Structure formats: structure tokens, C-alpha cells
Amino acid sequence: MEDNTITGEVKKKGWSFKIIMFWVIAFLITAGSAYYQRLTGPTYPSSGVVSFQGKDVKYKLDRSCDTSRNAVVKLENIDPTIKGFIEYKRYKTNDDKTLVEMKNDGGTLSAEFPTDKDRVYRVPAQKYEYRVILVKDNQKSEIPSEPVVLRFKGDVPLVILLIHVIVIFSAMLVSTRAGLEFFNSNANYKKFALWALAIMTLGGMVLGPIVQKYAFGELWTGIPFGIDLTDNKTLIAWIAWIVAAVASFRSKNPGRWVLGAALVTLIIFSIPHSVLSGNTPVK
């Protein structure tokens, strides 16, 4: 009798450990996916090192900026005798390029854009392409060789943005955990499928459009109104979880549907954020 009790306790502890491991693995996969998405996304600053006048010049150029201010460009540890310029124009237009001279203050080059004449275009979703040009002794270096694309966005209330980020991360976490339930002999697909669908609905289909309205003036720019990949990939994940949730009640083998929805979610959320995002129409 005593042996059976001990065996039962070990089994309970074993299952608890297994469940904890499922959540740990789900968290690591989700965190890794989120980090990769942020690191490779089009809003992550463009950075690198170039050689000019025999010295390495490090740069970090923003690719996103709030409409409440100009985009600031700064290069540090520069030879005080080097001149710098920002060359910019509106993205995908026939505008003439504008050249803004940078101020060299003790080895720090800095300037901002757009200039007063272009400030009317500093609106949500407006994109600019720009780069820095260094000049000294008839030598010139363009940093980087291909212009950086910067997009302006409206200010999103911090509370709304934080809630959105937390809920979306939770949706990815629960989605991944639901997929791992496929490897649990006592799987509860209904519970995880419904939770994943509910959180995905709140984060992606409710809070997502609200954040986008603040940032870019539009609630939805995916299908059928546009090709914005952020909206479209959210829509695909949402539909996948609707299918998985229905299958968890009706299918004889719901595990494959839940695992499939989890894999779809993981793959599409690994795609860089804001790819194929809109650009304010030229007027």
C-alpha cells in the first residue's frame, strides 16, 4: 500500500515537471521568435561600420520616428574637420533630393530632417529615404550605400501600447504551448485552442487595429483593403485558431489541427514586423 502511494506521488511530480517544461520551452521559443522579429524588422535601426579617411566610422540610423518631432541623425567620434550632410527625399516619389548640412560639434556630427519646407509631409505612414554623406579633401563616403527608409508614425498612448505588446506576446506564448500539447499523453486541446483564440482575438483583432489607428491613422490595412503584412499575418493566425478551436470539438484527431495552428502562428510571427507596410499617398 505504501509503495503504491509513493509511486502515485512520483507520477504526480513527474507530470508537474513535464507541464513546467512545456511552459519553459514555449516561453523560450516565443521569446526567441519575438527577438528575431524585432532584430530583423524594418523598424530596427540600420547600423554598421564604414572606413573613411583611414578611420572606422560607426553609424546607427533610425528607421522609425514619431510625427511629433523631426528625425535626428547623429554620428559620434568623427574627425572635427570632416563635413557631413543628410541627403533625403520622400520614399518612392520623383521629389528632388534635399541636402542638409550637419553640424560638427567637437567630433559629433548631427542634424535633423525634414526641413521646414517638407514638414507638411511629416505625417503618419509617410516614408523617407535618406543617408549620410561625409566629405573631406575631395573624398566622399555615402553611409550607407543604399538609402535607409524611415517611416513616421503617430504617438500611441503608452498604456495601450504596453497592453497590446503584453497580450500579443501572451497570444504567441499560449499558441506555442498549445502546439506542445500535441506531445502530452493527457492533452486538453479544447482548453488551449480556446485560450489561444481568445487572446489572439483581443491582441491582434481588437488592440492591434487600435494601435494602428493611433500610429498610422488607419484601423485596418490588410485584406481586403490593402497588403499590409502585419495585418494579414495576424488575420491568418486568427483564422488558423478559429479552425483549430472548431476542430478541437468536432475532429476525431484535434491534435494535428492545434499543432498546425501553432506552427502557422510561429512561422508568420517570425516574419519581420511591418514588412510591406503602407506609405502615405503622395498629394
Which residues does each PLM region occupy?
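Alpha-helical transmembrane segments of multipass membrane proteins
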Residues: 29, 203-207, 268-272
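Non-cytosolic membrane-interface motifs at loop->transmembrane helix junctions
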Residues: 157-163, 218-231
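Glycan-association/targeting regions that enable binding to alpha-glucans and other polysaccharides
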Residues: 3-169, 175-176, 182-185, 254, ...
